[in-house]
């Protein structure tokens, strides 16, 4: 089972309920700005195209998107951000990656270290856990939305690597270069994904029990609440019952 996709689904639902629109917009604007540094034409820049699509899905105003692109290309003055990935461990030896976009490295290092230390985790050295993850496209679909055989044929024909049974959902995994094609095929088939993103997918998982589950959730939420944090990935394997209890 892929606990990371269950956590992503729970986060998506909790985010919608909590209506943390300002936080979501801040993260999306940073992603658009960084992506636009590689070129302001979304047709020629897959990362920018994906970032703009994510912003539109959250109903971000077009003017906000335009200004974020212009800051990235240097057309208008903006904050000088850098992207950093921190590595660390949670309870039970769970591996964690934290991707940040920051204008103050020292401040962010201190905040991330504090979040780890206060919530049952610890920072690791560069390279300590990154090798446990691979960059993949992940598209999560409710089982009620599609039959396995039909979905399998659809996604494999459009470049996906695998279709996994993930409890109440199907999870499609693909190479980042195939992500847009697979996602477009899914949408054209009339299927709306629960979650769709390119991220760091763990190659192996660690199962937690008892109090470790609550500690791990608290740590993940503390890291994700960081002002500079864009994404948090881990190789914890939550089961559905554990997450439903946490989401309560």
Swiss-Prot record:
One Pfam family, short name: Transcrip_reg
Any one GO molecular function term: DNA binding
Subcellular location: Cytoplasm
InterPro entries to which the protein is assigned, alphabetical: Integrase-like_N (IPR017856), TACO1_YebC-like_2nd/3rd_dom (IPR048300), TACO1_YebC_N (IPR049083), Transcrip_reg_TACO1-like (IPR002876), Transcrip_reg_TACO1-like_dom3 (IPR026564), YebC-like (IPR029072)
GO biological process: regulation of DNA-templated transcription
UniProt keywords, alphabetically: Cytoplasm, DNA-binding, Transcription, Transcription regulation
Domain of life: Bacteria
Any single GO CC term annotated in Swiss-Prot or TrEMBL for this entry: cytosol
Family, as annotated: Belongs to the TACO1 family.
Protein name: Probable transcriptional regulatory protein Acid345_2125
């Amino acid at each position: 089972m892929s606990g990371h996709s269950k956590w992503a689904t729970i986060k998506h639902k909790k985010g919608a309920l909590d209506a943390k629109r300002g936080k979501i917009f801040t993260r999306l604007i940073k992603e658009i700005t960084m992506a636009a540094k590689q070129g302001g034409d979304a047709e020629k820049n897959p990362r920018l195209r994906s970032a703009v699509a994510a912003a539109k899905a959250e109903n971000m105003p077009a003017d906000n998107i335009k200004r974020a692109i212009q800051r990235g290309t240097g057309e208008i003055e903006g904050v000088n951000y850098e992207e950093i990935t921190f590595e660390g461990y949670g309870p039970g030896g769970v591996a964690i990656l934290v991707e940040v976009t920051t204008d103050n490295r020292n401040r962010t290092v201190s905040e991330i270290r504090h979040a780890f230390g206060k919530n049952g985790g610890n920072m690791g050295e560069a390279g300590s856990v990154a090798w446990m993850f691979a960059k993949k496209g992940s598209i999560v679909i409710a089982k009620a939305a599609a039959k396995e055989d039909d979905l399998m044929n659809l996604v494999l024909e459009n470049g996906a690597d695998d279709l996994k049974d993930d409890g109440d959902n199907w999870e499609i995994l693909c190479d980042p270069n195939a992500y847009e094609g697979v996602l477009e095929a899914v949408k054209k088939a009339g299927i709306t994904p629960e979650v769709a993103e390119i991220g760091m997918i763990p190659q192996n998982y660690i199962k937690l029990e008892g109090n470790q589950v609550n500690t791990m959730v608290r740590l993940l939420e503390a890291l994700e609440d960081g002002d500079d944090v864009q994404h948090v990935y881990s190789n914890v394997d939550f089961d559905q019952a554990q997450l439903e209890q946490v989401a309560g």
